[in-house]
């Protein structure tokens, strides 16, 4: 079973039969699920219902159970129609709940003076919305109540409930007031801090301005001194000098384009810097590799370069030799090697024949000098014997001219051998 929320309010009670002063009555209502009042809006207002309503001035008790917006009676007239029923229902709930119900879009849509409870007789009481103008009272809406035959109501309990509600309201008001005071003090403190910061900023700006003025004056003074030095040395200044202000305002006066746009300049700077950084990294890497290669040269044995002919980006370390060139080189090497072999073998055969002939002459007791033997046997092989004779003459001359020379021991040994023979 859902919990019922109670609200206590006061309402004027008027007796139409007696011309007495208005009395005050207590009114208590019970609303199911009072938590929804916090989120009540214009759309959900029409669905809100009051479970029970009690009104008493101290002698009689009148009540109405389970009623809603459709139980209101609207008196159409000026500015009042059936569509105004929603506004009237809102004003009734606002009065009965002590302004707990509040919707800004519906507030003060109906012009009225007050709510009253009119006692017509002991059978019917009516809660009426009235508009009073020039002693004329006009009814806008009414809600009929019926008497309670058996039952009683504790007015003191209702008064105590009303008192507690007032206490809660006062406590809430005091808390809100304290919070407001704290917020105001905080705002004042922040305002004072802001004033101090503004003063500090002004002081800083003044010092910065003074420093900049001093630097500019020193710059102008230095420029005057330099001009004076140039004038004393008869150095003519260029006529193309541009003022600093013109240089500074050049980019400002130009329209925004890809040349002076900050975003474009930053993008272009990145594209220029990144390749430089990449090249720098590559150089550092190659330098580290070279240092590592030098440090490890004494420890690690160098291997043959398997990538000697490796081509990088279409280039090679040495000229590329085609298959045809390699075949020609091999043929030249074989030919030269064959010629050398033939000459060496022929010389060895001729020298062996000469030695045999000399041995036979010695056996017969005939002595012949080296030059004579070269002449007798010079025609053994045409040009080859002449070559040997010239070699013998060279050897004998070398022996006579360089007998004490140690730089050619092999030639000296051969010449001595020839002379002894």
From Swiss-Prot:
Entry keyword annotation includes DNA damage: yes
Matching SUPFAM superfamilies: XRCC4, C-terminal oligomerization domain
Region (Disordered): 365-421
UniProt superkingdom: Eukaryota
Compartment(s): Cytoplasm; Nucleus
Keywords: Cytoplasm, DNA damage, DNA repair, Nucleus
Annotated Basic and acidic residues bias: 391-409
GO cellular component, one term: cytoplasm
Keyword DNA-binding attributed: no
Any one GO MF annotation of this record: chromatin binding
Quaternary data: Interacts with DNL4 (via BRCT domain). Interacts (via N-terminus) with NEJ1 (via C-terminus); the interaction is direct. The DNL4-LIF1 complex interacts with POL4.
Remaining remarks: Present with 876 molecules/cell in log phase SD medium.
Similarity-based family: Belongs to the XRCC4-XLF family. XLF subfamily.
The protein's name in its UniProt record: Non-homologous end-joining factor LIF1
Species assigned in the record: Saccharomyces cerevisiae (strain ATCC 204508 / S288c) (Baker's yeast)
Lineage: Eukaryota, Fungi, Dikarya, Ascomycota, Saccharomycotina
């Amino acid at each position: 079973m859902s919990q019922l929320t109670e609200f206590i309010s006061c309402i004027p009670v008027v007796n139409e039969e007696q011309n007495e002063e208005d009395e005050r009555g207590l009114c208590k209502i019970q609303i199911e699920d009072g938590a929804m009042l916090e989120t009540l809006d214009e759309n959900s207002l029409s669905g809100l219902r009051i479970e029970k309503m009690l009104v008493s001035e101290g002698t009689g008790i009148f009540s109405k159970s389970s009623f809603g917006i459709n139980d209101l009676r609207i008196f159409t007239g000026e500015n009042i129609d059936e569509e105004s029923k929603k506004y009237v229902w809102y004003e009734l709930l606002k009065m009965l709940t002590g302004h707990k119900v509040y919707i800004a879009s519906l507030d003060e849509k109906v012009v009225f003076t007050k709510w009253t409870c009119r006692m017509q007789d002991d059978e019917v009481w009516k809660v009426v919305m009235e508009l009073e103008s020039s002693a004329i009272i006009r009814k806008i809406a009414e809600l009929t109540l019926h008497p309670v035959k058996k039952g009683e109501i504790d007015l003191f309990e209702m008064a105590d409930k009303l008192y507690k509600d007032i206490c809660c309201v006062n406590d809430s008001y005091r808390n809100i007031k304290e919070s407001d005071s704290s917020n105001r003090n905080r705002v004042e403190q922040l305002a004072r801090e802001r004033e101090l910061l503004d003063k500090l900023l002004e002081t800083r700006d003044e010092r910065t301005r003074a420093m900049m003025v001093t630097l500019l004056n020193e710059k102008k003074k230095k420029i005057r001194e330099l001009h004076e030095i140039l004038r004393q040395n008869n150095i003519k200044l260029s006529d193309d000098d541009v003022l600093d202000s013109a240089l500074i305002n050049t980019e400002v006066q130009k329209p925004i384009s890809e040349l002076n746009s900050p975003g474009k300049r930053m993008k272009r700077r990145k594209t220029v810097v990144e390749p430089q950084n990449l090249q720098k990294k590559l150089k550092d890497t190659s330098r580290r590799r070279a240092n590592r290669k030098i440090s490890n040269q004494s420890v690690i044995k160098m291997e043959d370069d398997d990538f000697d002919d490796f081509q990088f980006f279409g280039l090679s370390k040495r000229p590329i030799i085609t298959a045809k060139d390699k075949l020609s080189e091999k043929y030249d090497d074989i030919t030269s090697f064959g010629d050398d072999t033939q000459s060496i073998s022929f010389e060895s055969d001729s020298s062996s024949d000469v030695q045999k002939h000399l041995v036979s002459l010695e056996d017969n007791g005939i002595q012949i000098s080296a030059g004579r033997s070269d002449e007798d046997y010079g025609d053994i092989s045409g040009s080859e014997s002449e070559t040997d004779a010239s070699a013998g003459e060279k050897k004998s001359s070398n022996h006579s001219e360089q007998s004490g020379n140690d730089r050619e021991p092999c030639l000296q040994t051969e010449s001595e051998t020839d002379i002894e023979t």
